[in-house]
Regions:
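Basic/aromatic-rich interaction segments and small domains that mediate binding to polyanionic partners
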Residues: 26-62
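Intrinsically disordered, low-complexity, charged/polar segments
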Residues: 2-4, 49-75
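Mixed-charge, Lys/Arg-rich low-complexity intrinsically disordered regions
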Residues: 1-17
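Intrinsically disordered, low-complexity cationic segments
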Residues: 10, 27, 69-70
């Protein structure tokens, strides 16, 4: 898995189930995407649901102008 600064920043529409993601804002939270809701319209938003390495459930919502860090791509 990549370090925080090495992970590429990509558009939310490029995230797939199985990817390990985190926000571009300062955080060390990473989680594996289990389900994606979206895009919702006006404004376009994607909500990602998943679990972190400790098994805790996580979710984040990203907008059209946001970027997401992808630490590992789904195989």
């Amino acid at each position: 898995m990549q370090d925080l600064g090495d992970a590429p920043e990509i558009h939310p529409s490029k995230i797939r189930v199985g990817d390990v993601i985190g926000a571009t804002r300062p955080t060390h939270m990473r989680y594996t995407v289990k389900m994606i809701s979206g895009p919702q319209t006006s404004p376009r938003r994607w909500t990602f649901f998943g679990s972190d390495a400790d098994g805790r459930q996580q979710n984040d919502t990203f907008g059209e102008d946001d970027l997401v860090r992808r630490y590992a791509k789904a195989s």
